[in-house]
Amino acid sequence: FGSGAYAVYPGNNIKEHLQPFTEGALKLNGPTKMAAAVMPYYTISTGEGENVANGYNKYLITDVLRGTSGYEGVLCTDWGITKDITSVYKFEGKPFGVENLSEAERHYKAIQAGMDQFGGNNDMAPVLEAYKLGVAEMGEEGMRARFEESAVRLLTNIFRTGLFENPYLDVEQTTQIVGNSEFMKAGFDAQLRSVIMLKNSDKSLPLATKQKVYVPQRYMAPTTNWWGVTTEPKTVDAFNMEVVSNYFEIVETPGEADFALVGIQSPDGGVVYDASDLEKGGNGYVPINLQYGTYTAETASEVIIAGGSPLEDFTNRSYKGKSVTTINTTDMQLV
């Protein structure tokens, strides 16, 4: 989201943030020696070269990643960074720092920075326009050489996987792998081992099969998710009831049951932004709620200078005194 366009590095500790790349992805034991492709991330790395999203930052891409670290693989932009954005809270494009450029100019700037591929763009038109911009600046020969440089990196990965030498599917081999009962059992066993039992002091588990079980439904309040989609209030089954019926006898009331099977989710406090708050004269920012029920930010800072988006005319994003109620607050009532 545009509300989180900036990354800051207190204490000038940018080197620590680079370690996953320099000590991890760029130093692998496999035959490629480094990750085949890398995404640089959406944010503006404040103070590290030009204050633009990493995919447009020539200092980070060409000087640091390509130069200092010697990275030779594909660099793909994060999803949708060349698209337009109209609001800090809508899930749209992420052209952070280059909002004033056209879509074609953004593509060209990313190419100049050293990017090879555009994530989330299936339209060749702005890429071709970017090519024309490059020809006007560096000539046909220079821009073609730049495109071929990226083409070599992209095609190298395709050749490495054998997609040119043998692009055909071996049906016999596929039928032995897809839906393989041994593989499915291994996957199911792994899921069982991943389940964490917090307590079983009275030895209630495991349960005998075919006991009577009460399974309450979950109520979901109306909300707007991070895609901007508004959902209506609804009551849903917490589990696949057909599967539950294979093991237990499902009853309609708690009084009929030997035990209850209650499914809940972690508190869902929304997306920390409320358009209705903005409409009422607020700044739109609301607190994160990590508890069931209502949380009021009584002790938050009066001033939070985290603004800077060209889509906002203020810098103070404080949400002190504002309240947020979790969407699934009734989950705790079920328990």
Listing of model-derived features with the role each one plays in the protein:
Residues 1-335:
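Glycoside hydrolase catalytic-domain context in secreted enzymes
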